[in-house]
């Protein structure tokens, strides 16, 4: 027993308290206290002067009972989720569950449902409910009377409750800006009663009939209480400060002694005190009002109404019939309480609870859903938004569209959904919207979306068969000779990009059918079931295991590698036999780029071929070096040592120099580069080399005319002149036989065997709109004849030329132009120009694919067309989306040193097909 009352946790009632409650017989009034609290013990009984034990732990659904001896009321304190301590416990549990994200809407639904269950219990087992919130489910009447019929709770009549409980409202705090007088407090209470009564009547919570009312209100009695005079939860810090001030206050003792002396001189007590009897009476009335204005007295007035039997009579005006009001003894009430607690609270916590009453089963199942009206409201809004979003997507969707269009349509549908959809179910509704739109897209409206070599998706339907892809993107490109421009579809394979288009447009060009084409070596099958080469054979750059063996490997592995290296050296030895008898100034490396200081890691057998050939040609290089530096006057001259021409019969016996054993069953699937195997050839040529006419068709005064080369921008249609100083050095035997030379060669001898070659070179770039222009430097577009200086061409041929450069055409979109052609006008001289272009893209260096570079005929206009698309070993090398000004060579570049010069072979007819690469073209001097 605490102070003057008993307290226990239901249903553990102490035996002595049970005996006292039995002595009350039928005079026990049950008062339920339900509401909110913000203290650690979740105590709402502090206004009644009652507290739980010190070891009490608040829990959801727990009922703490209070009884004061000598009274007729049993107080039930319902601890619910509306208590701050219990809701804090639930929040802690949710936060500790890391697998489930915390959702405030779902959390609020749970605490409200649990509170309403406790409220339902209070409304059925209490006569008076203090500070309650109303949410009684009326359909409890469909099953509760039947289920209570065979239980001890059958005594509480067919209305399944003791009475229509009288609802009282307790406000623990009085407004601080109002005076705490009797008139002010009463005014606040009356105003609040009017507001509450109007609200409850409007929503039919209180009616004129007790059987149809959820709760009852007293007719002529106060049912709102403001705690204005008692500080329930005082600030402990402020209280400690006040105590400290009282302790530190020291009154003046001398002043008190003087007061006592004055009072001693008075003739009678009270002689010097003023007569203020009205003030004392008013203060006494206020003190008396403060003593009487307590929650306990307020509650006892309503308890008295219940004891005398006028509980409902004062609550309902129009119906005078006796309502279902019952007073039970403690044992009967306890049995009734146990039954109601089990039906309304305990069974709801058990999801596996079985019952034969269908109405009760539906109540347990649908209680949370019926109560969460906000959830229904949000669901309705999301349903409206979902319909609006689906309609927006379907109305804007074309017949066929790709992923980018689908994403844009889905984004627009999401915006349409958000105009209506709200609440915690919006994310699930958006996921459903995305699934419906995705299904609509895949239902015969999805595009193929196979990416082209220019990274454009195919626009044809995915579920319909089509022979070839089509992205709908059209480019303007020029033919091999540069005369005719045409529209080309976006290519989807290497053959379309580098071969088929140029073959197709050549049939429409009246110049392409007449020009002399260089025949690049291609694959010639000997069987019908030829195939692409195996990955390791076709792409040795990726076969890093053959670049070198560790020193601690087994001897068997070393022998296998040696045998494999010997097999790869066989075609190289045949080639060395054809070139060993000839001397050259700067021989072309058989690895197509080993003389460019490239990395030799992973080159495999090609590196061995390069080393073997370098050893055999070292003597000729030393001789050439001595001859090229013999005189100081010839520092700016290129020295070409004239060799003794071989006889035609001897050449036929030796055979062509580029005769290398190639595979006739396997082909190279990509472009030829510096480390691809020599015995593998591509199915089609990706390069083009054509002689479009004599050198006289180009005039440096007018540049390239539109009728000859179409699509050039104004001022960017000039070739760059290149003056090359050359000196011929005769072989020993030829010095005694120059009387056998022709007249033209004798004329060159008279000029001292020194030649000044006039070569015209142009690096042509072309964008996807068909605009063509020349470059006069790696970072400068040719703007006219004023940009051409004496050393302008040297900037082009002796520097890395970028593979991509921004097109100078005026357009909102910055188009990238690609290096597509190299124009060469050869001079009239007893020498031939050799071309050996190498394009470096990423880690690959692409070449023409010929063992020996082609030689160009004299006094002719030649055009080298570069590949439209570059493909490496394992992946397509796509052009960059935009060019970084700080790194213009990041997309690729043309290596310098692609031109060479070699003496003219009078026994070789370059007009014959396939002879431009024949003879000793591998022995030439690089310019």
UniProtKB/Swiss-Prot annotation:
Biased composition (Polar residues): 613-633
Composition bias, Basic and acidic residues: 644-654
PANTHER family: AMPLIFIED IN BREAST CANCER 2-RELATED, NONSENSE-MEDIATED MRNA DECAY FACTOR SMG8
Transmembrane segments: none
Protein's job: Involved in nonsense-mediated decay (NMD) of mRNAs containing premature stop codons. Probable component of kinase complex containing nonC and recruited to stalled ribosomes.
Entry similarity comment: Belongs to the SMG8 family.
Sequence ranges of Acidic residues compositional bias: 551-566
Protein keywords: Nonsense-mediated mRNA decay
Protein's name according to its UniProt entry: Nonsense-mediated mRNA decay factor SMG8
Example of a GO biological process term: nuclear-transcribed mRNA catabolic process, nonsense-mediated decay
InterPro entries xref list: SMG8-like (IPR019354)
């Amino acid at each position: 027993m605490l102070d003057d009352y008993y307290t226990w946790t239901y249903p553990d009632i102490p035996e002595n308290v049970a005996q006292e409650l039995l002595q009350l017989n039928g005079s026990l009034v049950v008062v339920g206290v339900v509401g909110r609290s913000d203290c650690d013990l979740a105590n709402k009984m502090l206004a009644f002067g009652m507290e739980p034990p010190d070891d009490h732990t608040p829990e959801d659904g727990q009922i703490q009972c209070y009884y004061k001896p000598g009274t007729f009321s049993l107080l039930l304190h319902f601890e619910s989720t509306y208590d701050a301590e219990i809701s804090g416990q639930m929040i802690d549990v949710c936060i500790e569950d890391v697998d489930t994200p915390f959702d405030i809407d779902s959390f609020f639904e749970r605490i409200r449902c649990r509170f309403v269950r406790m409220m339902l219990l209070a409304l059925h087992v209490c006569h008076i409910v203090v500070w309650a919130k109303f949410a009684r489910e009326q359909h409890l009447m469909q099953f509760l009377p039947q289920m209570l019929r065979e239980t001890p709770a059958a005594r509480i009549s067919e209305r399944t409750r003791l009475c229509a409980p009288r609802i009282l409202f307790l406000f623990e705090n009085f407004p601080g800006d109002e005076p705490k007088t009797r008139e002010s407090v009463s005014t606040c209470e009356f105003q609040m009663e009017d507001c509450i009564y109007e609200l409850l009547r409007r929503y039919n919570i209180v009616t004129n009939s007790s059987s149809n009312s959820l709760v009852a209100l007293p007719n002529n009695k106060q049912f709102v209480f403001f705690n204005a005079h008692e500080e329930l939860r005082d600030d402990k810090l402020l209280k400690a400060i006040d105590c400290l001030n009282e302790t530190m206050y020291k009154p003046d003792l001398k002043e008190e002694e003087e007061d006592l002396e004055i009072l001693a001189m008075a003739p009678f007590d009270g002689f010097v005190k003023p007569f203020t009897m009205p003030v004392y009476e008013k203060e006494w009335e206020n003190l008396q009002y403060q003593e009487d204005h307590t929650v306990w007295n307020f509650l006892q007035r309503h308890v008295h109404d219940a004891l005398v039997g006028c509980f409902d009579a004062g609550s309902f005006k129009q119906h005078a019939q006796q309502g279902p009001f019952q007073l039970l003894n403690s044992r009967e009430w306890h049995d009734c309480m146990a039954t109601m607690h089990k039906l309304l609270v305990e069974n709801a916590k058990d999801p596996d609870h079985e019952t034969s009453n269908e109405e009760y089963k539906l109540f347990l199942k649908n209680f949370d859903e019926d109560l969460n009206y906000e959830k229904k409201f949000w669901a309705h809004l999301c349903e409206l938004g979902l319909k609006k979003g689906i309609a927006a997507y379907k109305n804007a969707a074309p017949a066929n569209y790709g992923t980018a269009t689908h994403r844009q349509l889905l984004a627009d549908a999401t915006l349409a959904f958000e105009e209506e959809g709200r609440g915690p179910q919006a994310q699930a509704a958006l996921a459903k919207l995305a699934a419906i739109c995705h299904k609509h897209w895949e239902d015969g409206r999805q595009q193929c979306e196979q990416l082209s070599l220019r990274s454009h998706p195919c626009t044809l339907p995915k579920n319909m068969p089509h022979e070839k892809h089509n992205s709908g993107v059209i480019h303007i490109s020029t033919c091999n000779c540069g005369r005719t421009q045409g529209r080309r579809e976006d290519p989807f394979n290497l053959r379309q990009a580098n071969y088929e288009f140029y073959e197709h447009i050549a049939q429409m060009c009246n110049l392409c059918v007449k020009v002399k084409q260089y025949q690049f070596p291609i694959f010639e099958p000997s069987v019908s079931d030829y195939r692409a080469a195996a990955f390791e054979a076709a792409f040795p750059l990726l076969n890093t295991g053959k670049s070198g063996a560790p020193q601690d490997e087994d001897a068997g592995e070393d022998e296998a590698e040696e045998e494999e290296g010997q097999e790869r050296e066989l075609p190289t030895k045949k080639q060395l036999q054809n070139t060993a008898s000839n001397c050259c100034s700067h021989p072309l490396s058989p690895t197509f780029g080993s003389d460019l200081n490239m990395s030799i890691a992973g080159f495999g057998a090609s590196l061995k071929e390069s080393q073997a050939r370098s050893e055999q040609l070292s003597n000729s290089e030393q001789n050439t070096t001595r001859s090229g530096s013999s005189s100081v006057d010839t520092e700016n001259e290129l020295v070409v040592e004239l060799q003794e021409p071989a006889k035609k019969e001897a050449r036929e016996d030796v055979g062509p120099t580029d005769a290398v054993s190639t595979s006739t069953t396997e082909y190279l699937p990509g472009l030829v580069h510096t480390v691809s195997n020599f015995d593998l050839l591509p199915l089609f040529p990706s390069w083009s080399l054509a002689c479009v006419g004599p050198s006289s068709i180009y005039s440096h005064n007018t540049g390239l005319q539109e009728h000859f080369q179409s699509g050039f921008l104004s001022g960017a249609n000039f070739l760059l002149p290149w003056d090359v100083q050359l000196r011929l050095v005769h072989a020993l035997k030829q010095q005694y036989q120059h009387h056998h030379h022709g007249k033209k060669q004798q004329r060159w001898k008279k000029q001292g065997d020194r030649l000044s070659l006039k070569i015209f070179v142009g690096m042509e770039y072309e964008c996807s709109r068909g605009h063509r222009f020349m470059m006069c430097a790696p970072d400068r577009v040719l703007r006219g004849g004023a940009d051409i200086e004496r050393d302008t061409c040297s900037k082009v041929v002796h520097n890395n030329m970028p593979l991509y450069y921004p097109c100078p055409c005026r357009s909102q979109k910055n188009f990238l132009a690609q290096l597509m052609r190299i124009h060469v006008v050869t001079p009239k001289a007893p020498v031939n120009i050799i071309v050996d272009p190498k394009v470096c893209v990423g880690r690959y260096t692409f070449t023409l694919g010929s063992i020996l570079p082609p030689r160009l005929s004299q006094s002719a206009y030649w055009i080298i067309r570069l590949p439209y698309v570059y493909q490496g070993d394992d992946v397509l090398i796509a052009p960059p989306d935009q060019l970084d000004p700080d790194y213009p060579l990041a997309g690729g570049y043309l290596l310098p040193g692609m031109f060479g010069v070699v003496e003219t072979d009078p026994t070789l007819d370059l007009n014959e097909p396939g002879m431009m690469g024949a003879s000793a073209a591998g022995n030439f001097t690089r310019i």
